[in-house]
Amino acid sequence: MRLITRLARPLLRLIGRDDRGAIGVLVAVLIGGGVLLGMGALVIDVGQLYQNRAELQNGADAGALAVAQSCAAGTCAPSLAAQFATANASKLTGGAAGVALVCGSGSLGACPASSGAITDCPTAPAGANYVDVHTSTRTAGGSSLLPPAFAALLLGNSGYQGSTVKACAQAEWGAPTALTSGLAVTISACSWDNYTDIGTTFAPAPPYPPDSLPSASQDRVLQFHGKGSNTSCTTEPSGADAPGNFGWTVDSTGNCQTYINGSTYGVKTGASASQACKTALAADQANQTLVFIPVYVSVVGNGANAYYTLKGFAAFVITGYRVPGASASDWLNPANNCSGSSFCLNGYFTQGLIPGPGTMGGTNLGASIAQLSG
């Protein structure tokens, strides 16, 4: 009735008071002929289709991002798509949603060519890792048709059983080209190669279930300006830590972080750590924080004018450290604690997902980004 009133109100304003009775008769005729009933049925049924489309799109978006994140972490889990599609369904379909296809890079299987339709995903991105998640209508009873609320009751429309709604979302994952590092330190590519067997051996990433820490044998010692046990990585005189284990970078934020957006970044000479870095080291070590740090292939120049050449970003968990004026015992393998005149970072390399969006296209050293792309 509210719909009828809204439709009739503009007409009533255009006519005189004496003619409004005639309009009432006209409305009654329209109701009797099913015209306004048909309009109401159209509004309600189309509204349901739009609602189902929104739910399916939300489910596809969430599912594609979840699958991309699992792939970035090292193990693609396409079954996540169905979980998120169902989680975004409402009582309109009895809490059910269908996943017609999950496809993409690697083990996900190749996707068919895009149809260009609004309900389809865009063409596969060239040279990128991606996943497409296609969702479609499914009711709790297993039907692929969204049943009409009123449309089937209209004259001549008794055979209408409903419609199938579709949606698609695409997500990508890959290594970043720019990043604000979790700690203003850097390590050499030589050390990363040796400690990860050239990117083939990683410890599991935090958080960990009780009694499920990584093996102590995966704990590494990154010496500052020294070879340590990593005899294949040489070192240069103090103040130029290439290509030996780790060194400090220029703090871009005042919180012991370095913003890197390009192929080079600044060197901070010397072994001493700022108070901000001592605070950050203590928090990261105590909380088993996954930090993302740049990996360099060379150092150019000398002293404060020197700069590192970026290879990529690694994911690292600090288990202990010893720097001038601050230290913490290695919680994974205390036998690796530094002593005497040595300064070091202890920890292990893993694979991890950088929170938030970013620019992909870098060399994958364990740190990845996952984000929606279409």
Name the predicted role of every residue range.
Residues 70, 87-92, 136, 172:
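Conserved, well-folded catalytic cores of nucleic-acid-processing
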Residues 1-2, 144:
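Coil-to-alpha-helix initiation sites in intrinsically disordered, low-complexity, charged segments
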Residues 60, 93-95:
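Enrichment for repetitive, rod-forming helical segments
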Residues 2-87:
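Alpha-helical assembly-interface signal, strongest on the long, hydrophobic N-terminal helix that forms
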Residues 75-82, 95-374:
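N-linked glycosylation sequons
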